[in-house]
Amino acid sequence: MKKIFLFSLFAMMLADCSGQKTPQDYVPQRSDYSLRSDVRVVNDDGEVRWDSIIVYLTDAKGLTQELHSQALPLDTLQWNKGSIGEITEDDWNFDGIPDLQVCTGPMNGFGNYTYDVWLWNDETHKFEELKCDGEIYSPSIDSENKCIVSVWELDDDVEIVRYKWKDGKLVEYEREQMSASELADD
């Protein structure tokens, strides 16, 4: 009996020293995650006040992390809710790893959709919320120039703001205004 115990103890020590990973050593990679979102209506006295958006991130081990967003405080019953809570995966910080962009809704009838963005941090193996001084509307990613382009429209006025990364922060570096007809000509 002592021989079996010592042999088992020796085998466990050998496995522990061999560097084999145990389930406790699991570090999630970005590619391990599956994503889904859920838009929940919060009622106050029967009226829609806002929608809460929850993004569920489930890793390869089945562990789920939640990211919370708040949809714009509009009477969303009057809006097309089709894109609210929609998740897109784009590389916002140009590190080659997809980040998450969650639509929080339109600012007005011209679109001007706003988004919450979470960047994958490959050192901490977690998503971290993007902090930006400005509001980014209807964003597009310009991979060639490594910038994020924000477009705001109101009537015939269009404002385009370009953001670039500087010292780990997304900062505005160019702003231009034009008419929608000028934009259509480009």
Residue ranges of predicted features:
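Hydrophobic beta-strand segments that make up the repeating blades of beta-propeller
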Residues: L100-T104
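Beta-propeller fold detector
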Residues: E66-A71, E128-G134, E172-S179
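N-terminal, post-signal-peptide region of Sec/Tat-exported proteins
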Residues: R49-S83
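Calcium-binding motifs, dominated by EF-hand helix-loop-helix domains
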Residues: T88-W92
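Acidic, small-residue rich beta-repeat scaffolds with periodic aromatic anchors
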Residues: F5-S8, D16-Y56, P139-D186
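Acidic carboxylate motifs that coordinate Ca2+ or other divalent cations, activating on Asp/Glu
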Residues: D95
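Repeat-based blade/solenoid architectures
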Residues: A71-E86, C132-S143, L183
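Beta-propeller blade repeat segments, especially FG-GAP/WD-type strand-to-loop junctions
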Residues: T58-A60, F110-L130, R162-G168
